Structure formats: C-alpha cells, structure tokens
C-alpha cells in the first residue's frame, strides 16, 4: 500500500493526511467539473483523491519513482495522469489554457516552482500552494513588508493568504509551520515583458541593501550618483528616505517610468 511508503528526507517529503485540511486546500482552488489540475508532488495521493472528486482530470507530477509507480493503481477508472519527473523540467505547454495548480510544495524548491509558474508562457489561472508560513507571508506581503519575492510574484498574480497548517499535522513534522497561499494570475502582468528586465534590475537594486534608504541602495545597485537616485525618487513621488520594503507595486512602476525617461 502507498501509505507504507516512508517519507524521504532528501526529497523534503512530509505527509499531510488530515481530511479537513486536505478538503480546505482542494476547496481553495475553486474547482469545477471542467477543470484540469496540475498537482505537484502528490505523494501518497491523499490530496489527489479530493482533486479528482472535484475536477475533470488531474496531471500529477511526482519526482519519487516509487510513489509515481503506485499512484495510478490507487485511482482506477479516474482521469489521472502520473508523470515521474522533476516538476522544474515539466513542460507546462502540455496542459490546456486556464489549468489550475494545487501543490504541497517541498520547502527547498518553493521559489523555483513559483518562478516557473509565474513566468511560464502557459500560466495557470490559479495556483494553490502549501508552503512554509514565512514564505507565504512574504509572497502576499503589502507595502511596509515587501521583498523581491513579493514584488516578483505580485506583478504576475494577486496573492492571498489562506489556511495555516501547524507543523504537527505533517508526518514527520517539519521544523516550521505552513500556510496556503492562493495566486490568481493576472490577465496581463503589471509590467509588460519588454520592460521586465529593467524593472527587476531596479527592484533588485532597491533591495540590495535592505537597511539603507532607497537613495543609497539605488545608487549602489544601479551605479548612479546619490543625487541622481534622489531625483528619480522625487520625480516618482517617493521619499528618498523610504526603504525598499515600504514601496507598493505602483511605486516601483512609477520608478521604472522615471528610469526609462532619463
């Protein structure tokens, strides 16, 4: 039986079996009978069963060959496709438009998975991700607590925190608590593709020296004089004394506009 499969520490496996929490995660994806779901890391299939009950079909990408081999036999007659592959290598273009993602994400590849989903040509319409609580909070942060991660995600999607999952609900318990973050992909990113390179250069410069004021971090990160950095900020309606974490997405957009107008 699949349940006898012990979690592999090297793969960051932690089994979640609580039926109420699993139901809440599946519900967060707002599934209908027409939906195609990409499940990342199905593990023992405890969440898979709930997704199959709600969606049209599920494509489950599982890196662990032992688990991938066992999964299909657990759901005979169901529309389940199991792919034994590293999800970072999985071609999202195989999936139809407006597919949905549901995943209990291994902590060690969370940022890479989020980046893959948000920058893909074929993005999901919604991604429901169970991740480390601190990471979920960073992804969904607002002005005052922003980071490169939150800015990077929020130009592509609206981010909303959902249920918290304390560590004791996992086997074995991880060292930290988890939380569901729901990403609803924007029809159009807030920064168009041709400007994204400049945008991220500015954002990364702003966050390059977190404790410093923006005039200093932009000066160092962009290789410009502090006077020039201060002028850019003032023209964008931003206090030169502000710090990067204080800025909302709209502030960064105005700063990009001023940078390109130089």
Q: Across the structure, where does each feature detected by a protein language model lie?
A:
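Catalytic cores of RNA-modifying enzymes
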Residues: 1-205, 227, 234, 245, ...
């Amino acid at each position: 039986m699949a349940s006898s499969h012990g979690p592999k520490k090297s793969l960051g496996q932690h089994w979640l079996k609580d039926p109420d929490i699993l139901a809440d995660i599946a519900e967060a994806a707002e599934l209908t009978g027409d939906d195609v779901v990409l499940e990342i890391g199905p593990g023992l299939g405890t969440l898979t069963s709930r997704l199959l009950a709600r969606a049209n079909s599920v494509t489950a990408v599982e890196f662990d060959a032992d688990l991938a081999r066992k999964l299909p036999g657990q759901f005979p007659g169901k529309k389940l496709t199991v792919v034994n592959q590293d999800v970072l290598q999985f071609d999202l273009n195989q999936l139809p438009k407006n597919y949905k993602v549901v995943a209990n994400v291994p902590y060690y590849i969370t940022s890479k998975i989020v980046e893959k989903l948000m920058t893909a040509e074929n993005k999901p319409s919604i991604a429901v991700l169970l991740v480390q609580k601190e990471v979920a909070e960073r992804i969904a942060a607002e002005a005052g607590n922003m980071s490169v991660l939150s800015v990077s995600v929020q130009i592509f999607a609206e981010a909303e925190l959902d249920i918290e999952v304390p560590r004791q609900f996992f086997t074995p318990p991880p060292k930290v608590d988890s939380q569901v973050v729901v990403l609803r992909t924007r029809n159009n990113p807030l920064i168009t593709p041709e400007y994204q390179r400049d945008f991220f250069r500015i954002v990364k410069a702003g966050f390059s020296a977190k404790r410093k004021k923006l005039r200093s971090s932009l000066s160092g990160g962009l290789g410009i004089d502090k006077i020039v950095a201060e002028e850019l900020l003032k023209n964008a309606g931003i206090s030169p004394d502000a710090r990067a974490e204080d800025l909302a997405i709209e502030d960064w957009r105005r700063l990009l506009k001023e940078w390109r107008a130089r």
